[in-house]
C-alpha cells in the first residue's frame, strides 16, 4: 500500500544520499582537500541535507560504530527494487547502491553502519 511504498521511497533517498556523501568526501580526501572543510563549505547549500549533517561528521571522523546496519539497508533496497520492477519504475541508482552494500556485506563489513569513512568507500 501507500505506507509501504512511502517507506521504500524514503529508504531509496536515504541510502543513495549516504552513498553520495561518502563518495564526495572520498573525492575530497583523495584530492588532498580536508573533508571537514568541504563539509562546512557545502552543508548550507543545495547539497546539504539531514543525511549529510547526521552522517557526514561520522564519516569524516572515521566513526563506524554500528547504527542502522548495512544488512537492513540491503533488505530495504531489495524490497524497493522488487517493487520498482513490479510497477515498471526505473531505479538504476538504487540498484547501484544495493550492489555496493551487497559488496560490503560479502566482504565482512556488514556490521558497519551505512556511514563509512572516506577510506572505506575507496576500496
Question: Where are the model-predicted features located?
Answer:
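Interdomain hinge/lid region at the active-site interface
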Residues: 4, 13, 48-109
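Short amphipathic alpha-helical surface patches that mediate protein-protein
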Residues: 2, 43-44, 98-102, 119-122
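Active-site-proximal catalytic alpha-helix in oxidoreductases
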Residues: 1-31, 42-54, 72-75
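Beta-strand segments within the central parallel beta-sheet cores of soluble alpha/beta enzyme folds
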Residues: 34-43, 95-99
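Helix-loop "lid/cap" segments that line or gate small-molecule binding pockets
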Residues: 27-28, 83-84, 120
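Residue-level detector of well-ordered alpha-helical segments, enriched
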Residues: 8, 38, 93-96, 113
